[in-house]
Amino acid sequence: QDNQDCVALVKDIIEKLRDLGDDLLLGPSTACIVNAAEERGIPSIRLSEGNLVQLGYGAKQRRIWTAETDQTSAIAETISRDKDLTKSLLRSAGVPTPEGRTVTSPDDAWEAAQDIGLPVVVKPIDGNHGRGVFINLYTQQEIEAAYAVAIDEGSEVLVERHIVGDEHRILVVGNKVVAAAKGETVWVTGDGKHTVQQLIQIQINSDPRRGTAEEHPLNPVRIDSAVELELARQQLTGDSIPGIDHKVLIQSNGNVAFDVTDLVHPDVASQVALAARVVGLEIAGIDLVAQDISRPLGEQNAAIVEVNAGPGLLMHLKPASGKPQPVGKEIANHLFPPGTDFRIPVVGVCGARGKTPVAEM
């Protein structure tokens, strides 16, 4: 019993130290930019207990907060949070987006789906991190259930035409694509013994890349209302025991990132850079659904579904597979192009007498 108490105490201390580290240390997105700047000799000053950091001195300084900078306008950020407005602006510039509209009730969602054509996507108009997003919905029951979840994640709900393909996150910095990652769906495979809930713990959450701390690129999977709806579409619950080799879809947008930066077609790069400019963001995370990112968008009926301000960088720093991308260096170089003067002269004068005349010389 004493040994068990000691183990429990040590685990508790370790957890508290991790929480303390999360509170005191810069987040990974901010840290990678600061580290890249310091490698060039650019000084940094932490301005808050959070992630607000000053790079450079005086009139030469720039400020960042994760992947947002002092040039990220409130207008552009507000536009990016409104998915329907963003799509309208992108369409006016010729950027491909999925057809859709906002809806006000479950019945309205079903009516919109019929007008657009099945299958559809249902998602909150101002949600984030993929919460409340449901894809490839066919039936009235699925669409109305998805509406009920999506409305809890945002102020309004958007119904869109479903685009066939994989979701990609493309990072644009200063009108240039610097990283791209492909998302993968999350599945478990039945063994005839364990429940879906147990399989999630065994096959998904055991991955060391999953955790609640900021250094973990992937979050643990929990059976929330979104997962419950996904399981219900497969006539399952968290307590169901799938048969041997029976694959069960857990999350359609599991945010498991695979680096595909080297595969981005020039047409794709041009379109996503244009999307960032239309919204007004110098640093943007563009969500694109495409079957093959190495082909032009027009050849595959692909579409841009979201433009995000202050995008997370961890998926590019620690992809599930593929090479990490130097996104911190790219952002630092954008803020301070090579050859830029980022310091101001600082001279200290000390002594017992004559300090003022010397300082005024």
Language model features with spans:
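Activation segment
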Residues: G183-V186, Q291, G310-G312
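Glycine-rich phosphate/pyrophosphate-binding beta-alpha loops
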Residues: E306-L317
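Short glycine/threonine-rich loop-to-helix capping motif typified by GTGT followed
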Residues: S294-N301
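Conserved N-proximal alpha/beta basic substrate-recognition cap immediately N-terminal to
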Residues: Q1-D115, N128, G348, G354-V358
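Phosphate-binding loop of NTP-binding sites
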Residues: P337-M361
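A long amphipathic alpha-helix within ATP-dependent nucleotide-binding catalytic cores
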Residues: V149, E153, I202-S294
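N-terminal pre-Walker A segment at the start of P-loop NTPase domains
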Residues: P319-H334
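Active-site nucleotide/adenylate-binding loops and adjacent lid/helix of ATP-dependent enzymes
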Residues: A59-P220, P266-A269
